[in-house]
Structures are given as C-alpha cells and as structure tokens.
Amino acid sequence: MIAENNQGPTSKKAHTKVFNSFQTKLTVFFTALFLLLQGAAFLTVREAIVQNIFDQSRDQLVAANRIFATRIQATVNALAEGAQILASDFGFRTAVATNDKATILSALNNLGARISADRVILVNLDYAITADTGNPDALVTDFPFYDLIDRAEEEDRAESFTVLDGIIYEFVVVPVLAPVPIAWIAIGVEIDREFADDFRNESTLPLDVTFATGRDEDGWAATVSTLPTAAQSDLPGALAAKGAMLGREPETLVLDDGDYVTLVERLQTPTESVSVNAVL
C-alpha cells in the first residue's frame, strides 16, 4: 500500500514562513553579536589610546617639571651671585653701616638693573625694611618674611617664592657681612606673564604653565597663566574639585576648551606667605 501524502500548499507556506522567521532571528542575533563585539573592541582600543596619550603626557610633564626646576635654580643662582657681590662691596657696606639711604637705594637699583631683578630690598637686623626699590618712598615697615631671614642667617643664603603686595616673586636673601651680619639683601624677580611665556617657549614640549596662589582652605587663584582666558577662569574651580587628590602625580582637569593632563608642583614659600604652586 502506498500512504497518501496530505501536505498541501497551505502546509508548505507555513513551513516556509517559520523557516524565514527563524532565519531573520538568526540574522538579527548574529548582527547584534557582531555589533556588540565591534563596540567592545572599539571601547578597548579607545581606552588603550586614551591611556597611551595620558602616559605620554605624564612623561612629558615629568620632563617639563625637571626643566622647570633647572630654570628656577638657574634664576636663584644668578640672583644670589649678584646679591653677594653687592653685599661684599666695601662702599655699600659703609653706606649700610652709616644708614646712607640715598646711596643704598642707588646701589640697590643698579644691582637690580644689572642682573634683571625686579625688586631689591634691604632689611636691617630688626627685620625692618630700610630701602626698597619697589616702594622707595614708603615709611619703614617690617619685612614680612621672617622665616627667610632666619634661614639665611643659618645657611648664609635662603631662597623662596613669596607673594608680596599681591605679586608673586622668587626671592633670594643673603647677609651683608662686616664681618658679622649688619643687614640683609632680599633680591627678587617677578613671576609674571613674560616669565611664564619664556618658560613655555624654552620648553621643547607643548605645554602651558600657570602660577596659582592659595590652596586647600585658602582657595585657588590663577595669578599668572599662559592658558586661554576661559580655561584660566575654569582652572581654580577644577583644582579645588580635585582637592586632596592633587599631589606629585598628574591629574586630568576638565577646562573650558578640553581636557588637560596636569601636574601641580607646590613651590617653597616662607611660613608667612600664601602658598605658590606651579601648574604644568
């Protein structure tokens, strides 16, 4: 006997429909899987690229920090050398001993002009300013950074960043000896936009530099910067947001015009001065 075949046209259509539905689902599944794998691969590659950029930026910042330290030390040495030459000059020591203010001020101005210093101050043994090229007509006032004088007395020289009259200076203090100390010379260069531009231009690395005052509970102020104006305005808030995380390791800061890999170097300041930081 031969069995009768009951599959008609309707049954074949249903079979084809099921097959097509399964094929569609399979296609969608593999397409989704492919896109998922592609997305995961893209994110992995992107993360690797970002990490590589960060690592390169970190290495560049570490190198820039060494260049910065070398530049600062060279400035300190030049200031100290000039101050020590004046301090050992017999005529100058005589003027100091006799309190000849006109001669003292003239000598301080000549020294500043000769070594491109922006401010030269003579401080007596009572920490009082007796002559100041930055404020020549001022009445006698105390030199605000006792710590610098005390360190210079112990070590024959002291250097530090300070904020004086709202301006950042790099100061060097040396004694005037006859043969014991009879006064102190504080000689400084202003850390201004020209100083920051010179450092950036001398660097072989593409970087910006900001000198920021304050920190932590004092709040931040971007006093001098090579950053664009909008980014400079954003910087204090971005630094404050990082808070205690800011240290010797680079951090990423989000500013107006993009992300910056940043290294914050806390510079040496006297105990009486607001803190000064170099933000590279």
Enumerate the language-model features and the residues they cover.
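Short hydrophobic alpha-helical segments used for membrane anchoring or interfacial signaling
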Residues: 120-127, 207-217
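Generic short beta-strand
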Residues: 119-121, 174, 209, 250-251, ...
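Positive-inside N-terminal membrane-insertion signal
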Residues: 1-35
